[in-house]
Amino acid sequence: MEAKEKKYGEIEIEKAQLEAWPNPNPERDYMIEITFPEFTCLCPRSGYPDFATIKIRYIPDKYIVELKSLKLWLNKFRNRYISHEAATNEIYQALYDLLKPRFLEVVGDFHPRGNVHTVVRVRSDENYG
């Protein structure tokens, strides 16, 4: 069996790290909305793929996320066994830790599976307890 050589995209995804860039207008409150419609991960119970649209909304303070780094970093989830809740919370926490925004919301809108549609929402301004 011949060894499979990794494609350049696989290599970029493997080494992907989130990058913060300086906010060009830190004196102003403005909302950035990012939609990632092709999010995938693996169900930790069955191993079947889960598909979702990840929606990110934030009001930056000193930093904004560099979009290519975000895209590649989100693609790292595609071969991970992780629940909807854990994936959405991990995305939220990584962005919050990196950017320290004035406001952040991450929504994981997962495609129905077994006739169940799950939406996980994490916001910096809400206490759901």
UniProtKB/Swiss-Prot annotation:
GO biological process: queuosine biosynthetic process; tRNA modification
Keyword Amino-acid biosynthesis assigned: no
Residues bound to substrate: V65, E66, L67, H84, E85
GO molecular function: preQ1 synthase activity
Record field: transmembrane: none
EC number of this enzyme: 1.7.1.13
Pathway recorded for this protein: tRNA modification; tRNA-queuosine biosynthesis
Reaction(s) the record says it catalyses: 7-aminomethyl-7-carbaguanine + 2 NADP(+) = 7-cyano-7-deazaguanine + 2 NADPH + 3 H(+)
Active-site residues (renumbered): C43, D50
Organism superkingdom: Bacteria
This protein's GO CC annotations: cytosol
Pfam families: QueF
Cellular compartment(s): Cytoplasm
InterPro entries tied to this protein: GTP-CH-I_C/QueF (IPR043133), NADPH_dep_7-cyano-7-deazaG_red (IPR050084), QueF (IPR029500), QueF_type1 (IPR016856)
Sorted UniProt keywords: Cytoplasm, NADP, Oxidoreductase, Queuosine biosynthesis
Similarity-based family: Belongs to the GTP cyclohydrolase I family. QueF type 1 subfamily.
Task of the protein: Catalyzes the NADPH-dependent reduction of 7-cyano-7-deazaguanine (preQ0) to 7-aminomethyl-7-deazaguanine (preQ1).
Name of this chain's protein: NADPH-dependent 7-cyano-7-deazaguanine reductase
Organism: Aquifex aeolicus (strain VF5)
